[in-house]
């Protein structure tokens, strides 16, 4: 991959040098031919694969319900008419994606400078402690499926993916600079035996651009079928905006630094977001569906306005967190254990691990429907302010029984249980979330719902515990 010539105007990266886009009519016609040629080239190289960590094939995607492309089944359909109709729909989808790609690549943007030129200015000392350019002024490189991901991100920083192309990564991509990936809904697959796909390491000094900080992925779809490693392993600032993860048998995001997930979707994953010790995690407006461990927090986390459905564990809290305005429905079918506090406990949908020095999480304005909750002993008092526990069972450890305050919650169908002792005669060996197998002691519980429920004959529901400042 050669460094582009910044003096040539109107030439888009990823295209041939003889494709100027100065004339709008010639621009559109030229880009149509180039898009068709690129599609034909990537289609012919799909069998052999691209070198240097990248490869793929442009395909039409009719848009399945889960958002990830699957190959059409040639045996599906019982008549030639059905097969012809299906083929027509696929061709229409392919034409739409090609037109969308052409429209995105032919738009005019106020882009004026390449990332390599900014690095040259920074090395000369002209951009020290100075934000001279903005995100919209940095030129975008349209990456082709045969290009090397690591080389493209390190050279251009701002990279866009073609929505009519399926990208395939075949080796680990090491990112040590500021990077911004504009996905445009493109699908990225993995064909590698490496344990990590994107290794976001500590960044070196470089030029500052307004609107770019750390590593950012925007609107990318990751189809991780058959991949058992980590999609992201980050020790720097990582931002995921509208990213889609599906069928990841490993870890989607493993962060040792600062990670922000906004509007992301996790479907059928083993571990969604994992925040290691001393990490800072922010999760907003994300969807978790049929995951084993949606979120694992060992550091600090802010979890706001998310939705979870049929997860074995929506939140395994080993550190501290602020959990507000989330909706969690249903529980998955699993008998996993957790040994985070030294005792083997059955994993619940909301699982707060006991700790002698850490405080309780802030738990407010959450909706729980047909869920289970485990509360280990912590410092202070746990008060789930204005939360709805609809058909939810809460299991409290012995020391946590006296540290929970259930005033101000919607408790019509809640069930509260206290662990009295553990029956050693009913011990069973179960798999643990740490990867090993442990002996799980069966807890003998006591129903204490009426003892802890608020006395509604003495306390009116019209008090301020159920009101908020934004109500009329």
From Swiss-Prot:
Tell me the domain comment.
Answer: Contains a PML interaction motif that allows the subnuclear PML localization.
Function as written in the Swiss-Prot or TrEMBL entry:
Plays a major role to prevent cellular inhibition of viral genome replication. Assembles an SCF-like E3 ubiquitin ligase complex based on the cellular proteins ELOB, ELOC, CUL5 and RBX1, in cooperation with viral E4orf6. This viral RING-type ligase ubiquitinates cellular substrates and targets them to proteasomal degradation: TP53/p53, LIG4, MRE11-RAD50-NBS1 (MRN) complex, ITGA3, DAXX and BLM. E1B-55K probably acts as the substrate-specific adapter of the SCF-like E3 ubiquitin ligase complex.
Q: What are the UniProt keywords, alphabetically?
A: Early protein, Host cytoplasm, Host nucleus, Host-virus interaction, Modulation of host cell apoptosis by virus, Phosphoprotein
Q: Does the keyword Phosphoprotein apply?
A: yes
Give the residue ranges for region: Disordered: 1-90
Protein species of origin: Human adenovirus F serotype 41 (HAdV-41)
Q: Where in the cell is it found?
A: Host nucleus; Host cytoplasm
GO terms under biological process: symbiont-mediated perturbation of host apoptosis; symbiont-mediated perturbation of host ubiquitin-like protein modification
- Protein known as: E1B 55 kDa protein
CC per GO annotation: host cell cytoplasm; host cell nucleus
What SUPFAM superfamilies does the record point to?
A: Pectin lyase-like
Primary localization class, coarse: host cell
Would you identify the family this protein belongs to, as annotated? Answer: Belongs to the adenoviridae E1B 55 kDa protein family.
Q: What ranges does the record list as Low complexity composition bias?
A: 32-44
Stretches with biased composition (Gly residues): 45-57
User: Which molecular function GO terms apply here?
Assistant: ubiquitin-like ligase-substrate adaptor activity
Q: Which cysteines are joined by disulfide bonds?
A: none
**Subunit and interaction comment:** Interacts with host PML-4 and PML-5; this interaction promotes efficient subnuclear targeting of E1B-55K to PML nuclear bodies. Interacts with E4-ORF3 protein. Interacts with E4-ORF6 protein.
Residue positions, PTM Phosphoserine:
468-469
Residue stretches spanning the membrane? none
């Amino acid at each position: 991959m050669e460094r582009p010539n910044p003096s040539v105007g109107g030439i888009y990266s990823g295209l041939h040098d003889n494709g100027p886009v100065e004339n709008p009519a010639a621009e559109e016609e030229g880009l149509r031919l180039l898009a068709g040629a690129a599609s034909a080239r990537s289609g012919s190289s799909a069998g052999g694969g691209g070198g240097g960590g990248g490869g793929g094939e442009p395909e039409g995607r009719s848009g399945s319900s889960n958002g990830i492309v699957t190959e059409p089944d040639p045996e599906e359909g019982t008549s030639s008419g059905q097969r012809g109709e299906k083929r027509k729909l696929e061709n229409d989808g392919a034409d739409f994606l090609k037109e969308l790609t052409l429209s995105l690549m032919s738009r005019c943007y106020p882009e004026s400078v390449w990332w390599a030129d900014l690095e040259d200015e920074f090395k000369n000392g002209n951009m020290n402690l100075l934000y001279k350019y903005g995100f919209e002024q940095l030129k975008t490189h349209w990456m082709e499926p045969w290009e090397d991901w690591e080389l493209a991100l390190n050279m251009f920083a701002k990279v866009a993916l073609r929505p009519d192309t399926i990208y395939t990564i075949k080796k680990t991509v090491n990112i040590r600079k500021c990077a911004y990936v504009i996905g445009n809904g493109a699908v990225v697959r993995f064909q590698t035996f490496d344990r990590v796909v994107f290794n976001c390491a500590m960044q070196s000094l470089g030029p500052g651009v307004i609107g770019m900080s750390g590593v950012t992925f925007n609107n990318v779809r990751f189809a991780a079928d058959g991949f058992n490693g980590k999609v992201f392993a980050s020790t720097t600032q990582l931002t995921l905006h509208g990213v889609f993860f599906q069928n990841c048998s490993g870890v989607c995001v493993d962060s040792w630094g600062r990670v922000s997930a906004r509007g992301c979707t996790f479907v059928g994953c083993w571990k969604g977001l994992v925040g290691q010790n001393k990490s800072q995690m922010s999760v907003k407006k994300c969807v978790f569906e049929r995951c084993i461990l949606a979120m694992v927090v060992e550091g600090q986390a802010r979890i706001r306005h998310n939705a979870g459905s049929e997860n074995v564990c929506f939140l395994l809290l080993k550190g501290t967190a602020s959990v507000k305005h989330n909706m969690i429905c249903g529980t998955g079918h699993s008998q996993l254990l957790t040994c985070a506090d030294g005792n083997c406990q059955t994993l619940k949908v909301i699982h707060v691990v006991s700790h002698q020095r850490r405080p309780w999480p802030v738990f407010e304005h959450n909706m729980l429907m047909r869920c289970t909750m485990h509360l280990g002993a912590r410092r202070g008092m746990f008060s789930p302010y204005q939360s709805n526990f609809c058909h939810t069972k809460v299991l409290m450890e012995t020391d946590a029984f006296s540290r929970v305050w259930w005033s101000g919650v919607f408790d019509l169908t809640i069930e509260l249980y206290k662990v009295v002792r553990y029956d050693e005669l009913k011990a069973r060996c179960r798999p643990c979330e740490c990867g090993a197998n442990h002996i799980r002691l069966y807890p003998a519980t006591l129903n204490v719902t009426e003892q802890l429920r608020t006395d509604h004959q003495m306390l009116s529901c019209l008090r301020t515990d159920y009101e908020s400042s934004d109500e009329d």
